[in-house]
Amino acid sequence: MTPAGFFITAVFVALGIVLARYLNNQKGKYLAHVEYWVLSPDTKLPDLTETMAAVMQSPGIGPTEGLLFSDIRFKIGLILSSKNKNAEIVNRSEYRDAFELSGSAIRVQYSSESKLDSKKHLQFCVHVAGALAHQVGAVGILDMVADRLWSVTEFQEFLNRKHQATAFDDHVIVTQQDDLTFVVRGLQKVGVPDLSTLPVERDKLLLARTVIDRYAAASWDSMSPMTEPIVEYGDEFILLRAAQKPGSESARLLRRQPK
């Protein structure tokens, strides 16, 4: 091989390595993440031994869930309101009143980069958040993943009504934005990336919402992104997804051409 030929070959090999690394980085990394902020009027953590005892008395918690207290992926922390007055979430209009009444947020968090095979981590975190809220006389409970503020009464009624508190409708929120996009929040709790779609044509909004709802519900149930086409009105649709960051993807709704 001539020096020129060797050089060209080396360049192509190097480009191939770079491209392979780039494509590998573009693949979405697995992340299951649950995070609740229990908005407490106090500025310190309560006795967590009492919290654990209350959680273990719940009909929805058994020995399997109880073991998660010692799981290194589970964390409870304290965020002081006085030190986070300028945080964006504290100053959002829909949350401002609740934060003004709280001295701190008790953060209940579970994060896993290893694929999970059940929703027991979610069942556990929900009951821990409920127990803490009762223990401290909380102002509210903020679901950071689904971006939803629960009143304590509403949250306790939810737990009393559903001891197995892992249903899709209670954890995932699909919203249509002003720019004709859709946002799906909450799937990340079971290791499925949340979605932000590209703009949808106005006359296809209802169809898009139906397809996205079905995708989200099926992905939640299987704890894995749905890859099969979705059939509506005799047509097949797919969501063409692209990773943005761990736990989040952008998506475009496409009609699959008939064969």
Where are each of the predicted segments found?
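Feature marks short, highly hydrophobic, charge-poor N-terminal signal-anchor/signal peptide-like helices
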Residues: 1-9
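Core hydrophobic alpha-helical membrane-spanning segments
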Residues: 10-17
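Transmembrane-cytosolic junction motif
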Residues: 18-33
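Short glycine-/aliphatic-rich beta-strand segments at the starts of folded cytosolic domains
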Residues: 32-40
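N-terminal low-complexity, intrinsically disordered segments
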Residues: 39-98
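Structural alpha-beta junctions
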Residues: 56-64, 127-141, 217-225
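Internal, hydrophobic cores of structured domains that mediate oligomerization or house catalytic pockets
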Residues: 74-171
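Aromatic/basic-lined ligand-recognition segments
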Residues: 96, 144-259
